């Protein structure tokens, strides 16, 4: 049976994925009220992408994990964490912030044997990415992921457009997200390796001309 509920809504120009941390600077009065109400009721709020005037209907619940900083004027810096996904059925006004009647949803299928194979392929490719960029300095970070969580992590590092990130958020299987991430990451790593080769060739030529001159 599909679970439903009513949650506060926080439209943002960002796509939040499950398990993804999201720091926020809260300064508008309506969102100060939202955070205050969520803390008082120990409740999550929903992050929805708003892009080019469009408010998307599928989003991710955010749980307030920590209050990082409080300011004298009431502003807050908070750290949130993406939880389960939801679909808005009805937007409601009446409070300082929007609320939504939502249904919570997750992937339609269980993890298939193909997911583990994709997971291993992407994991190997990610090591190349880490060496090329230095962005992932702690190898245990990746080791702790499940294929489900890893499929969302890939969307974060692949530098997709907002609309593409939204499409990935709305995918209903880890296998589909991993396959998409593998294709994009392979292209990215290949391009980075080519850039390195070109830089080396140009550097060698520069050194050669300097010697000749």
Regions found by a protein language model. Give the residues of each.
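N-terminal low-complexity, acidic/polar interaction/targeting segments
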Residues: 1-213
């Amino acid at each position: 049976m599909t679970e439903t509920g009513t949650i506060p809504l926080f439209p943002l120009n960002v796509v939040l994925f499950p398990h993804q941390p999201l720091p926020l600077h809260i300064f508008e009065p309506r969102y100060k009220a939202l955070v205050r109400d969520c803390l008082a009721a120990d409740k999550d709020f929903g992050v929805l992408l708003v892009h080019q005037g469009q408010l998307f209907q599928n989003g991710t619940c955010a749980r307030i994990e920590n209050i990082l900083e409080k300011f004298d004027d009431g502003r807050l810096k908070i750290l949130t964490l993406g939880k389960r996904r939801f679909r808005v059925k009805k937007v409601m006004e009446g409070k300082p912030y929007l609320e939504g009647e939502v249904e919570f949803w997750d992937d339609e299928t269980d993890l298939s044997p193909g997911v583990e194979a994709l997971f291993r392929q992407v994991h190997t490719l990610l090591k190349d990415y880490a060496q090329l960029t230095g962005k992932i300095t702690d190898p245990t970070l990746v080791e702790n992921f499940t294929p489900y969580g890893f499929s969302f992590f890939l969307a974060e590092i692949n530098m997709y457009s907002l609309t593409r990130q939204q499409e990935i958020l709305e995918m209903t299987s880890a296998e589909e997200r991993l396959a998409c991430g593998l294709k994009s990451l392979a292209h990215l790593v290949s391009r980075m390796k080519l850039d390195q080769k070109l830089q080396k060739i140009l550097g060698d030529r520069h050194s050669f001309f300097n010697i000749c001159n």
